[in-house]
């Protein structure tokens, strides 16, 4: 009865108005799983390949009809007849069918759409919520959100070099209160920016994108907003950064054009260490470029005992890249993006590897999202304790927060908010 009888993909639009892949998987008893694939703006060079058509006459070359055709053709032909509960076998079959190292033939967006839709169909068939189906009986930890309230870099049209400035409400009692705290700070920040004559337009992930050049000015606005909202920075709410440093790494130097600085790896490490010293920052993502292993090592040696150092472009949710980072002693945390590796099975393998190496995991959205809230379930399924899913604006971001609230309600008394347990030391 859990046999796959039909797989159908279509081209839909993501939160940036760009095409993406949505997949329906139908089982013999009529159960259906549906999943939509996200996409990134600042993408790592080592990510699995997102297949785009390249036809400039449609969607400026960003169409995904080839990926859709791959699902409706080769992939469907291969998988119809499989038992949907055999996730590992299904993902392995698609990887072997693709036959490339980076899923470049069929497209990671094709493979991932099917992979997630299969898991959703199987969860429904077994009458379990997705987080329980994937994570088993132990899945009960609600993650601390990293709420992106000021956007810069590739996510906004302003001079700020650092891509994301985030708040983490660790003192909340539960996810419902964490979302409330974040919302209150978000709306307070809007008033503060407006009072300063700055734009309150929002970036790709729902955060504000004011025309300020200094990272310290952005951090000062956030601290003031936390306090005015009635909370204590560095006690109830902490700060986190996503530098996306690969985007401003040019010819072996870090070019902070907004601040008029050009830094060596050592100077960039010192620059970030100074921010950590002056502000209650507990997490920095991609503080160094994806290819600057020496810079990563220097940064980890300098502040890795005090701060969570998250590898996104560095690791791209890839067990091979992660293993190299662990061996080199670079970073201490992995950002988890399902579309970077391109299948649910490989994502879970990478999460497990990080966990065994005592690296933390942060479940993450992409800047191009949809209403699909799968990552909320995966955050709980893996008990990773942290999720990065944007600001308190845009329904594509709020879909994930709302799903976490529902999951917490469903779990009832056994639900546990990760809270202060994520703090180092």
UniProtKB/Swiss-Prot annotation:
An example of a Gene Ontology BP annotation on this entry?
Answer: glycolytic process
Q: Which cofactor is recorded for it? A: Mg(2+)
What this protein is called in its record is Enolase
UniProt keyword list = Cytoplasm, Glycolysis, Lyase, Magnesium, Metal-binding, Secreted
Where is this gene product found?
Cytoplasm; Secreted; Cell surface
Task: Check the record and name the HAMAP family matching this protein.
Answer: Enolase (MF_00318)
Q: Which NCBIfam families match?
A: eno
Top EC class of this enzyme: lyase
| Active-site residues (renumbered) | 205 (proton donor), 337 (proton acceptor)
Give the source species. Answer: Ruegeria sp. (strain TM1040) (Silicibacter sp.)
> According to its UniProt record, which reaction does this protein catalyse?
(2R)-2-phosphoglycerate = phosphoenolpyruvate + H2O
In this chain, (2R)-2-phosphoglycerate is annotated as bound at 163, 337, 366-367, 388
What PROSITE patterns does the entry give? ENOLASE (PS00164)
**Details of cofactor binding:** Binds a second Mg(2+) ion via substrate during catalysis.
- Tell me the superkingdom of the source: Bacteria
**Which pathway does the UniProt entry assign to this protein?**
Carbohydrate degradation; glycolysis; pyruvate from D-glyceraldehyde 3-phosphate: step 4/5
């Amino acid at each position: 009865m859990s046999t796959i009888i039909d797989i159908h993909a279509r081209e839909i639009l993501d939160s940036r108005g760009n095409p993406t892949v949505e997949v329906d998987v139908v089982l013999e008893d009529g159960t259906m799983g549906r999943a939509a694939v996200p996409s990134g703006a600042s993408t790592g060079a080592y990510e699995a390949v997102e297949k785009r058509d390249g036809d400039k006459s449609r969607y400026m070359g960003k169409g995904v009809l080839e990926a859709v055709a791959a699902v409706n053709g080769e992939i469907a032909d291969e998988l119809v007849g499989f038992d949907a509960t055999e996730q590992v076998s299904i993902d392995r079959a698609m990887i072997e069918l693709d036959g490339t190292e980076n899923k470049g033939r069929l497209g990671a967006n094709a493979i991932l759409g099917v992979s997630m839709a299969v898991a959703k169909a199987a969860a429904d068939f077994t009458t379990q919520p997705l987080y329980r189906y994937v994570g088993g009986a132990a899945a009960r930890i609600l993650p601390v959100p990293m709420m992106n309230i000021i956007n810069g870099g590739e996510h906004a049209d302003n001079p700020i070099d650092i891509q994301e400035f985030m708040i983490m409400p660790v003192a909340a009692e539960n996810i419902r209160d964490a979302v409330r705290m974040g919302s209150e700070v978000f709306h307070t920040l809007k008033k503060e920016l407006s009072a300063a004559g700055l734009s309150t337009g929002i970036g790709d992930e729902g955060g504000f994108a004011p025309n300020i050049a200094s990272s310290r000015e952005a951090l000062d606005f956030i601290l003031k907003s936390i306090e005015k909202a009635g909370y204590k920075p560095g006690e109830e709410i902490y700060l986190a950064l996503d530098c996306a440093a690969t985007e401003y790494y040019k010819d072996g130097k870090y070019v902070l054009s907004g601040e008029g600085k050009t830094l060596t790896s050592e100077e960039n490490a010192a620059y970030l260490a100074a921010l950590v010293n002056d502000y209650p920052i507990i997490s920095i993502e991609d503080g160094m470029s994806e290819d600057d292993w020496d810079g990563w090592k220097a940064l980890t040696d300098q502040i890795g005992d005090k701060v969570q150092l998250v590898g996104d472009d560095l690791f791209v949710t890839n067990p091979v890249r992660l293993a190299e980072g662990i061996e080199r002693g670079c970073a201490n945390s992995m950002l988890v993006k399902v579309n970077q590796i391109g299948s649910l099975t490989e994502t879970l393998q990478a999460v497990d590897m990080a966990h065994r190496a005592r690296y933390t995991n942060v479940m993450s959205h992409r800047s191009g999202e949809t209403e699909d809230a799968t990552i909320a379930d995966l955050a709980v399924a893996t008990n990773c304790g942290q999720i990065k899913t944007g600001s308190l604006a845009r329904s594509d971001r709020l879909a994930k927060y709302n799903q976490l609230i529902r999951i917490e309600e469903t779990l009832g008394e056994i639900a546990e908010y990760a809270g202060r347990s994520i703090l180092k030391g």
